[in-house]
Amino acid sequence: MTARILHFLKSTREYGVVLILLTLHVVCISLPGREAKLASSNLMTNLSRLEALPKITNRTVVLAGSSITGRLLEEYFTLPDQPIHNLGLDGCGSLEALETLLTAPQLPAVVLVELNTFKPGFEKTFQQVRDAHSPRREQAAHFLPFLRSRERPLDVLYDFTRSFKKETSSNQSGHLEWNDAIRVLHPPLVGPPPPPTVKETAYLESARTTLTRLRQAGCKLAFVLIADSLFYDPWHDPNFARAAEIAAPLDIPVFDLRKATGVESLAWTDAIHLTPAAARTMAQFIEKEIIPLAQ
């Protein structure tokens, strides 16, 4: 009996050590660098998807969406005389994804640019991805099939753990009427967005250059803003104002999808996906209000 107890304590201690090491790895290594790693992975995913562009017929409108808009199924678009191919670029809100488009053999007709591209702090992630990027990593996308899947296991696991409580609340309420209660915890920012730092200014100038090059190459652009979580986003209005300021001299239209489509009253299944009904509403708005820019 004593031997069994000692063996149990020893094995338990070993399991405890392993658990502690895993926890430290997640807290100290994985999570802090996740945005840069995920953005770099998104970059390789986008490269493989861009290879499909030459196979698309001239009659097809190619929509390079981002985040939620990039996951809208093509069957949700209903206009019979305007076939849609949703390229579904990952991280299209990030500047590195926009720069990737410049290397494509054929530019998409319409690109939706997420307004959180200009959220403070993104310039750090962008620089990390740029520093880590190399031609060898681009070539790796051809040999790693999971990078070309629409949902990578890491993303699914991360978003499930991050949005478990949000999913439960969504299933219970079925919509976002309770969003007003969240504003008590996260009050909206008052006044204009804070002035950009030196790094942010350089980042925004780089974004302007990239957007200008895309426009000169014949690509139609549109800025879109959509809440990507159930929680109230205090950066919503400042993001919209900053993006509108950037878009004005470039003649880029700006759409607030949350207000235009009534997204606050639409149900979400988790942090990434819209329900089929909400997705159809989103797709129809894109068809009627955004895609005509490519005509």
What are these regions (language model features)?
Residues G33-T57:
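Alpha-helical transmembrane signal-anchor/signal-peptide segments
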Residues A64, I68-P145:
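Membrane-embedded segments
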Residues L115, K124-A222:
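Secreted/periplasmic serine-hydrolase-like ester/acetyl group-modifying domain
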Residues L221-V224, F240-L266, F285, E289:
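Extracellular serine-dependent O-acyl
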Residues W268-Q295:
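Histidine-centered active-site loop/cap adjacent to the catalytic His
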